Amino acid sequence: MQTEHERKDAGTITVPTAVSNYNLDCILSYCFDGGSGYWIDRIEVVDDDYRGAKYGSEVITHGGKLKVFVDGEEHLLTKPMLLKGCELYAIRRKEWRPDDFDAEDTDIILQYALFGDVVYG
């Protein structure tokens, strides 16, 4: 049996985790197909430049940017921001299982990406 001293956290470590373009596309697809619809007013592709992407949810992984409109304010979404949202999710939830994500998980990731925290829901 471990002593109280042995059970205490010694610190934390950051473990690099691969996030694929497919993961990012799926995250945004879930968000845009309803997961974040309760707080997002509308989404636009910056300069209407899809960069070869078939869907708006794929623009980020093709190097484009999105404008996300919320409560009359415009927020820019980029790939580095979305990756930061993924990182915050993994750190705060202590897991990264994109194959098991549902609309709630992806909504949280998008809010982390745009606001650094969960603001809605």
Where do the PLM segments sit?
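Short, flexible helical or helix-coil boundary motifs
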Residues: 31-35, 89-93, 117
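Acidic, low-complexity, intrinsically disordered interaction modules
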Residues: 62, 77-95
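Short, compact, well-ordered microdomains
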Residues: 92-120
